[in-house]
Amino acid sequence: MAKDIKFSADARSAMVRGVDILADTVKVTLGPKGRNVVLEKSFGSPLITNDGVTIAKEIELEDHFENMGAKLVSEVASKTNDIAGDGTTTATVLTQAIVREGIKNVTAGANPIGIRRGIETAVATAVEALKANSVPVSNKEAIAQVAAVSSRSEKVGEYISEAMEKVGNDGVITIEESKGMETELDVVEGMQFDRGYLSQYMVTDNEKMVADLDNPYILITDKKISNIQEILPLLENILKTSRPLLIIADDVDGEALPTLVLNKIRGTFNVVAVKAPGFGDRRKAMLEDIAILTGGTVITEDLGLELKDATIEALGQASKVTVDKDSTVIVEGSGAAEAIANRVAVIKSQIESATSEFDKEKLQERLAKLSGGVAVIKVGAATETELKEMKLRIEDALNATRAAVEEGIVSGGGTAFVNVLNTVEALDLSGDEATGRNIVLRALEEPIRQIAINAGFEGSIVIDRLKNSEVGTGFNAATGEWVDMIEAGIIDPVKVTRSALQNAASVASLILTTEAVVASQPEPASPAPAMDPSMMGGMM
């Protein structure tokens, strides 16, 4: 396929047009009074959202050169979303500002490589200054504020702070669609896995159809139990203690299952059997997690252990186990705290080295089950369109909150960027590097300018007053008042602000140093096939 090639100013200006189209679409959503963007879907109702990365991913331009520019900005939004989970619109606004100012200087004859060095130095200084201005987040109220700012809902802020308090910072918080119109929080404490009882005759509460076991022993094995004789000596020993038993095995079938059920119905023995969670290597890892949590041992041939030789010492224990037809919850396992902490550390290191998103997600789930529990925010709304929009907002808020706990917070609403202007301006640079620094200085003003414009105020007036205000004082675009931003709860996570700036500078620098762009030529439309004369019949 033939290629179109553009050079120098032609190449850069075509890409800048794409940058502007995408950024102008996304930046209308910035701030407390930002607007929504409606995205057409190939099927179903349109998606209404103010989520920067969702909008950026949908934009596809007809001109190949413009599309490359748009895709590079979309990459900034995606990368920021991957690292910090929020701040995608801010990153887009910063990218546009750096590109716009940079192109002016490159066109005027400045060396793009020198400008790039200046931009990199200025951004590194700004990031250090942001970190120096950060305030750690530890209490529930601060977490609720971060989530409320990101989601634009105090109620959502309360749900997220409550969820993080109950399951911990490493805990899994999932967002699901509610069957009703109300949004609610559901917390499952302890370890839960998606396997229910193998027979409904094992339930202890016929009304709720659940089996509750108090202070049970837990037999954990990756073997299939078909012959009751294999575990009979163990069952006899447990029977003497009058305690219930939970069996977690590859499967329980053959004569073993009806024998266990019969003893349960007769009241001889309270036992519940469930299948082991997961598949393959993941199943072995999850069984090991359960064993460590409950202080038991996995009966497996890998360790040279047989069921017939199992003793009570090899069994796990917990204060309570609840089993329904779909899931099992183990509460307060008797495992040693040190062993659990070591296992958590191992899983954390596996998460860091995992390359696949799926593997990371599954490891994160295992980590949560070991270290606290699982919280589910069930999102309710009147229409499907509103539901999708609300889910996106809550996901952003959850990511922003985790980022805040990790690296602390700074004043929100674009104030933090203006607060570091003096530090960046003090850099002793010369020539094109000084030009690069000045480009960053101008770009740092852009988020607050856009927030003010979206709220109906004059951006330049707001910036001038902000520069002359004390550090921490900022403009509340929602009310038009000047307030102490952190006290007013208008805050941004440091991780979000620094990621937005670093990613914007990285991609903008690449665009400025571009000297040639190669794109595929659009294929000409194939002509319609000529009609076969023999098919014209009696028309002649």
From Swiss-Prot:
CDD domains: GroEL
Binding site for ATP: 29-32, 86-90, 413, 476-478, 492
Superkingdom of this protein's organism: Bacteria
EC identifiers of the protein: 5.6.1.7
InterPro entries on file: Chaperonin_Cpn60_CS, Cpn60/GroEL, Cpn60/GroEL/TCP-1, GroEL-like_apical_dom_sf, GROEL-like_equatorial_sf, TCP-1-like_intermed_sf
GO biological process annotation, one example: protein refolding
Reaction catalysis annotation: ATP + H2O + a folded polypeptide = ADP + phosphate + an unfolded polypeptide
GO cellular component: cytoplasm
The family this protein is said to belong to: Belongs to the chaperonin (HSP60) family.
Function: Together with its co-chaperonin GroES, plays an essential role in assisting protein folding. The GroEL-GroES system forms a nano-cage that allows encapsulation of the non-native substrate proteins and provides a physical environment optimized to promote and accelerate protein folding.
Cited NCBIfam families: GroEL, PRK00013.1, PRK12849.1, PRK12850.1, PRK12851.1
Record's protein name: Chaperonin GroEL
Lineage of producing organism: Bacteria, Bacillati, Bacillota, Bacilli, Lactobacillales
